[in-house]
Amino acid sequence: MTNTRKSHPLLKILNHSFIDLPTPSNISMWWNFGSLLGICLMLQIMTGLLLAMHYTADTTTAFSSIAHICRDVNYGWIIRHAHANGASMFFICLFIHVGRNLYYGSFTYSKTWNTGIILLLTTMATAFMGYILPWGQMSFWGATVITNLLSAIPYIGTNMVEWIWGGFSVDKATLTRFFALHFILPFVISALAIVHLLFLHETGSNNPSGIPSNSDKIPFHPYYTIKDILGVLLLMTILLTLTLFSPDLLGDPDNYTPTNPLSTPPYIKPEWYFLFAYTILCSVPNKLGGVLALIMSILVLALIPALRMSKQRSMMFQPMSQCLFWALASDLLTLTWIGSQPMEYPLTLIGQTASLPHFSIILILMPLANFIENKLLKW
């Protein structure tokens, strides 16, 4: 008699995706981050649902409803901070996941890669709208500055901004629609994640060596379920440590001040995980140019498969490409640091200098390194 998980119409899908899935035997800990992102998404949906039960999307009561959650709701403080810091853990896993796919050449799975880019953009939009909901000073001014960037679009820009705002400034209509979208988008992300997995399981997973592993595969369960549990425990340890000992470490103190449209904070900045793109935006003196640079700082990922010239898939045996990869990683850290500082000399100059390698490494130096490495290996 066939096992139920192999014959039941619903369990069969789960079985082929998480239990009997043929997986390369040599994948490293860097392959853990896909499952960690799934855990983060579930955690965010659960904590977000509990917060939404007590939150009011109204400009007069939004800030006090957050205070009510932290003070009066049973364990409301831990739910609120787990949700806020959970977003930070989500983006840490997300950036490492993208970096791993870059390093090991998994972007050659174009369908999986492109759905991943859409997932990244959707997650960034969701996180941005979540940052607006506490309705503190940085929420209000962050919403005003970032949405106002659309006004750089010729002809339709101003109309688009007013359409998003639901009026002539960021107000109640803006907060209400951002809350509605912030609530629904995680479910869209869940659907996109299923599509992402569907495309991945069409081709099978890549591995560190970058060569086909069809002759050496093992079932996902129990080997990689056990391995993933270790990653989950480490993630939860870091998240709980952050939430319980230093919940506001990654937040902004200005967001503990209720919104005042008549008082601008000294330096308006988004959450830390957007700072690299924000620095690139601020580094271009022209408004439209800055907006295009901001968009391209993410969309440049979509060009990587087309620019790849290497005959090898993984960077494991490509020292020049490895140096460029780590230069790109350190450049992103520099951009993040500059974004957190007030825009004044010499920080603006460092930001402009660091913005250039972000594009030049991906668009020029990586393909050039691939070409040189091919020649050195006489390919």
Curated annotation (Swiss-Prot):
It is a multi-pass membrane protein. Binds 2 heme b groups non-covalently. It is found in: Mitochondrion inner membrane. InterPro entries: Cyt_b/b6_C (IPR005798), Cyt_b/b6_C_sf (IPR036150), Cyt_b/b6_N (IPR005797), Cytb/b6-like_sf (IPR027387), Cytochrome_b (IPR030689), Cytochrome_b_C_euk/bac (IPR048260), Cytochrome_b_N_euk/bac (IPR048259), Di-haem_cyt_TM (IPR016174). GO terms for biological process: mitochondrial electron transport, ubiquinol to cytochrome c. Heme b b562 binds at H83, H182. The chain crosses the membrane at residues 33-53, 77-98, 113-133, 178-198, 226-246, 288-308, 320-340, 347-367. It comes from the Eukaryota. Heme b b566 binds at H97, H196. Keywords: Electron transport, Heme, Iron, Membrane, Metal-binding, Mitochondrion, Mitochondrion inner membrane, Respiratory chain, Transmembrane, Transmembrane helix, Transport, Ubiquinone. Its main location: mitochondrion. A ubiquinone binds at H201. Its cofactor is heme b. GO terms for molecular function: metal ion binding; ubiquinol-cytochrome-c reductase activity. GO terms for cellular component: mitochondrial inner membrane; respiratory chain complex III. CDD domains: cytochrome_b_C, Cytochrome_b_N. The cytochrome bc1 complex contains 11 subunits: 3 respiratory subunits (MT-CYB, CYC1 and UQCRFS1), 2 core proteins (UQCRC1 and UQCRC2) and 6 low-molecular weight proteins (UQCRH/QCR6, UQCRB/QCR7, UQCRQ/QCR8, UQCR10/QCR9, UQCR11/QCR10 and a cleavage product of UQCRFS1). This cytochrome bc1 complex then forms a dimer. Belongs to the cytochrome b family. Component of the ubiquinol-cytochrome c reductase complex (complex III or cytochrome b-c1 complex) that is part of the mitochondrial respiratory chain. The b-c1 complex mediates electron transfer from ubiquinol to cytochrome c. Contributes to the generation of a proton gradient across the mitochondrial membrane that is then used for ATP synthesis. This is Cytochrome b. It comes from Cynocephalus volans (Philippine flying lemur). The lineage of its organism: Eukaryota, Metazoa, Chordata, Craniata, Vertebrata.
